[in-house]
Amino acid sequence: MEKLQFQGGARAIDEYAEYRRIVGDDDGGKLFTPEEYEEYKKTVLPMRLQNRLYVSWRSPTGMDCKLVGPETPCFCTHRYKQHKTDFQELPKERPLLLPCRVSKCACKSFHYIPLNGSRPIRCRCKHFADEHSVAGTYHCTQCTKCSGFHSSFTCGCSQPAYTHDTVVETKEERLAQGKPVGHDVPFAAMGGLTGFSSLAEGYMRLDESGAGAPSTSFLESSESGTSHPFLKMYYQPIKVQAVSEPSGIVTQVSNMRISEDDDMAYFERRYQERLLKEKEQKRQKNSKPPTTNRP
């Protein structure tokens, strides 16, 4: 079979990916010419770097449970990148509205709604989020008893979804709260993404936008995250055994994970120790003198 080779093919793919991340849907589906592309960058990029908006789904505790990115869906089912995200001058009124740019969509501003797996969450009227109107109070289109979308879906932060708010803020407003803003990037509709960790849920992030860094007492504790998961589960029983039995310290050392061992070697060593222990118990049982019944 003949092998096809294209000179510079990988470079062309990288250039197109960069073009799509910068332009987004602003070209209307027709690629800009090189001259139009350069003119677009001269016009839009300075405005985008200066007036970037950070969008997050925030819990009542102040944690950003979800940092919105270009592909994050809105209540209207359209992506964040399909909403208005670039402003020549930021509006003075708050909250900032980011209307949907898709034709005939009545969405007046981006509104994040979480998913339950891959499906929309349900309202208290038992209908899904995409069965509600995207305008006004988000009333249900399938029934008349629903006055507006209201879901008791529980977020990973243990707070219900209806207590969260979609927050749109500027770089200065975010810095004033001590939250990360990342580097200035030319890409469209970056929202609240500031790094790879932004893809994680808020309760899993260790920066100021999430749960925060662990305390010093946690990092210095003997059962810290450097321990093996087996030790983290059985640390207290091992600790009690070390005090109650003379050979407890030997057992504790045997249970410790050696950094050079991989997982299979670790559990194999534990398995061999258990076999030796069973053989020793069996040998001691067989070595006991038989009991004789005297008349």
From Swiss-Prot:
Organism superkingdom: Eukaryota
Stretch list, region Disordered: 272-295
Residue stretches of biased makeup (Basic and acidic residues): 272-283
Pfam families assigned to the protein according to its UniProt record, in alphabetical order: FAM221
Family label: Belongs to the FAM221 family.
The protein's name: Protein FAM221A
Originating organism: Xenopus tropicalis (Western clawed frog)
